[in-house]
Amino acid sequence: LGDVYKRQVNISVDNTHIPNGMEQDSEKECNRYSELIKSLGGIDLQLLGIGHNGHIGFNEPSDSFEKQVHCVDLTESTIEANKRFFESAEDVPRQAYTMGIKTIMQAKKILVVASGEDKAQIVKEAFFGHITPYVPASVLQLHNDVTLVADEAALSKIY
């Protein structure tokens, strides 16, 4: 992720922070990353995509919005969606560190990107449906500074 980001965005690497995916001690890395976020005064801008099931930041549908930074087992659909970034499906990690919903919601500003007709239904549910951890992105309705950047196709079910 870091290498892809650095090639695409004109922001100093010193101003970006990504969990160390090579750290084997997940509790240690989650704590380190949480403390880093706190020490820097929180997250200024949280950039998110939205998954077909409403997941954000590898936070799959569940029964809670309370998690902070944590390690997750990736679902088969998430592995499938991310294999385009790797040479083969076998190279895609099966676990990832992610900010939990609680951490995401503490960001000062959140920018959500959605594209394609296949995202239209979940965009409608997330931004105009009931707030539920079974559609994780729906919690963004409670944040005071969220911007959705989407193409016409992704917005087609809301107008």
Question: Where are the regions that the model predicts?
Answer:
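Short, flexible loop segments at the rims of nucleotide/cofactor-binding pockets, characterized by
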Residues: 23-25, 87-93, 126-127
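Short, small-residue-biased leader/transition segments that mark boundaries at the very start
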Residues: 1-5
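Solvent-exposed alpha-helices and their adjacent loops that cap or buttress functional pockets
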Residues: 9-10, 37-40, 65, 102-106, ...
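A short secondary-structure junction signal
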Residues: 28-31, 57-62, 68, 122-126
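A glycine-rich beta-strand to alpha-helix segment
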Residues: 35-61
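ATP/nucleoside-binding phosphotransfer catalytic cores, i.e., glycine-rich phosphate-binding loops
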Residues: 102, 106-159
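Ligand-binding beta-strand-loop-alpha-helix segment within the catalytic cores
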Residues: 6-45
